[in-house]
Amino acid sequence: MKIAVYGKGGIGKSTTSCNISIALARRGKKVLQIGCDPKHDSTFTLTGFLIPTIIDTLQSKDYHYEDVWPEDVIYKGYGGVDCVEAGGPPAGAGCGGYVVGETVKSLKELNAFYEYDIILFDVLGDVVCGGFAAPLNYADYCIIITDNGFDALFAANRIAASVREKAHTHPLRLAGLVGNRTSKRDLIDKYVEACPMPVLEVLPLIEDIRVSRVKGKTLFEMAESQPTLNYVCEFYLNIADQILSQPEGVVPKEIPDRELFSLLSDFYLNPINSGKNENIENNLHDFMII
């Protein structure tokens, strides 16, 4: 099974991906996580350091694939999760989709691409071009990470559009949304009411999730010395169990931008009609679509 994780930049995709990978490994699966970001920090909380990228390794070998060995590009992370960083082209040049393609090609050359029960692609930011959507070409499921905010759900809607487009030519389905570090889910519920899709889990607003990224540890590793965090790990295990049940998933029908803008902004501007919103003044922004 191959999973592509998307979401707005900075929403916590890598932290969530690493913990989902551990949860899948805890369920007895052989897992490979592939970071698809030039920052090559997707697997940082699994390995504790920035591992070399496949592109860097290929460049050092003059792209002689026969000179590349599995141990050159695949690193063992916490909990037995194998880790690969695709890397990316220089800033302002090249295509991220090409890098993903080269990564998959390299893993196939090493006979490693089909050795795993689960391959999880952790993909940078929003889908702004076909290159960034490249991991969807290989995925069975897409998971979108969001929060209870306007911008993240706007990005989620664009990703849903990419899933729908790719589903025309690939056996791809949207497994659902994961709400990350949010104390409420009312806006998420408002969105999925208009654009039906599963909500796999909503993770609580706790500082330890953010701190884990800085420490270079997953919540599972932190829970070994802080048993009070075990309850947070259960959220990720629940996501893993839903994925392993091979859900039917959906081919989403995204909401047109202007309709989504009206839907979400109305939620902020008319809290009486949209339900209670205690922090309306903190969440209100100036929105404008030209």
Curated annotation (Swiss-Prot):
This is Light-independent protochlorophyllide reductase iron-sulfur ATP-binding protein. Its main location: plastid. It comes from Angiopteris evecta (Mule's foot fern). Its EC number is 1.3.7.7. It comes from the Eukaryota. Its cofactor is [4Fe-4S] cluster. The keyword 4Fe-4S applies. It is an enzyme of class 1 (oxidoreductase).
